[in-house]
């Protein structure tokens, strides 16, 4: 399970000058509270990264990092006047710092991090909500803990699932037949 946050801006507020409605005149007032903006769940943005990765590569490990498939581009920016100055509403509900993104990732959250000075954001990690197990303080325990932690990250999980799917397809034709281990190894290699 992947839990994403924060919400992101789906569109600029409607106004006759900046973002007009085609069929009637409407001025959407967002000056009172930021809840009046149209926010979207970042799970949908994450789903676009998954589908784009699958469309390009036929599997889903390329979903994190701004240059490796994790970027959500062309998000709307709302420019407005406040106290005589032009301000810009960032496209994510809150600005998640690099440090906070790391802390959230360690707790199992997938955060959409706005890239400063741009109209895009990116997913920099994709940990699952599964808490890593503790295997002790020995060297073997630390290695096992790291291995378990890596196996709970979604990009690695998607690779393993795709390989398992591929092996299942290969072996589907062999259902009901009896083969030795060496014969199966030869077919898979």
Which ranges hold each PLM region?
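Long, contiguous, structured domain-core segments that constitute the functional module of a protein
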Residues: 15, 19-184
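Small-residue-rich
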Residues: 1-20
């Amino acid at each position: 399970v992947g839990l994403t946050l924060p919400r992101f801006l789906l569109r600029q507020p409607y106004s006759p000058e900046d973002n007009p409605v085609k069929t009637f005149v409407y001025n959407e007032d967002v000056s009172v509270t930021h809840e009046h903006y149209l926010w979207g769940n970042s799970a949908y943005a994450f789903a676009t990264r998954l589908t784009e990765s699958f469309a390009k590569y036929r599997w889903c490990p390329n979903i994190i990092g701004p240059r490796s498939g994790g970027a959500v581009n062309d998000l709307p920016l709302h420019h407005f006047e406040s106290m005589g100055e032009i301000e810009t509403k960032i496209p994510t509900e809150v600005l998640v710092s690099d440090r906070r993104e790391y802390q959230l990732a360690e707790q199992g959250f997938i955060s959409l991090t706005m890239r400063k000075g741009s109209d895009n954001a990116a997913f920099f990690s994709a940990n699952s909500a599964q808490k890593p197990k503790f295997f002790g303080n020995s060297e073997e325990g630390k290695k096992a803990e790291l291995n378990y932690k890596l196996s709970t990250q979604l990009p690695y999980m998607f690779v393993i699932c795709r390989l398992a799917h591929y092996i299942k397809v290969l072996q589907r034709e062999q259902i009901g037949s009896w083969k030795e281990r060496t014969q199966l190894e030869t077919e898979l290699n």
